[in-house]
Each structure stands twice: as structure tokens, then as C-alpha cells.
Amino acid sequence: IYQSTPKIDKDAFLIAQVTDWEKLNLLEGEANVYFENTFIGKSIMNVAQQNDTLSFSLGRDKRIMIQRTKENEYTSRKFMGSNQTQSIAWKLSIRNTRPEPVTLTLYDQLPVSRNNNITVTAEEISGGSLDEAKGIITWQITLQPGEQRDLALRYKVKYPKGRNLIIE
């Protein structure tokens, strides 16, 4: 499975997930990692802290192209009474240039307010799943070879007039 958090890094990372790994008698420590008969690096195996599935990264895959761009036509600031509302919009574009289908877990986030005078409202998350307590949005998508998909992330932040917030 592939994972990406384009807000932090635009690359997709291939994640190996091994079930029934307890039967393999793996030792904790440094491991050489091979993928498709090619040495790709070293990883630390922390078997003491694993659950029923052992997960580790096999590195970046540049054949899954991801862009996260701000949509200026949806981004705005409005003043209403004693509050102001700022709308932010992002476009996530994902393209699979691999010769086979890929499954990708994509993560992004909304700001999370700890102040009752500041509210954050998701307006569009393109079918993603939102964890409101953490603000984390998760998309599970499958892309066919050559397929491109665009996802929208739009939210608004309402806060008292006169406050200066940095919202991204």
C-alpha cells in the first residue's frame, strides 16, 4: 500500500505490511531492505512495538505524482458583524504513472481550534474521512495505470474581528 501526506512531502511512500510476522522469528535491530531484487536501504525493525501487522517503508515511488496547490478562486476573507470568516481551498492532484493499479492512503488536515471563539468547518473533502478531534482527513483511493484524480479540500475558519490568525 502507498501512503502520502502532501502537505509535508509530495512523494508517495510504499509501505510493506506483513501479517503473521511473529512466525518468522524476526530479531529487533537494523535490517537490509530489498524490493524487486534491488537493495533500497536499511530500516530499523522494532518488533517489540508492532501489532498483528508489521509495517515498514520501502521508500519513495516517484511514479506516483502528487501535487497540492492552493485554489485562489475559493480562498477569501469576509467580515460579518463582530466576526470574520476566512475560506481556504486546496486541490490535490494524484497521477499513477506505474504500469499497474495502486492503492493509496492520502492524509491531509484541517486546522483544529482549542478556542471556543474560533470555529473550523469542513466544506468539501471529496469523500475523505474526517477525524474531527485531530483534524485529520484520510482518503483511500485506487488509481488505474495512467489515471489522474483530483480531490478538493475546502474549509472555513470563523473568528473574532481584530484577531490575526495564520491559517493554512
Annotate each PLM feature.
Residues 119-126, 136-139:
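C-terminal intrinsically disordered extensions
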Residues 136-148:
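A surface-exposed beta-strand-loop module
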Residues 1-91, 98-116, 124-127, 145-155, ...:
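Intrinsically disordered, low-complexity Ser/Thr/Pro/Gly-rich interaction regions
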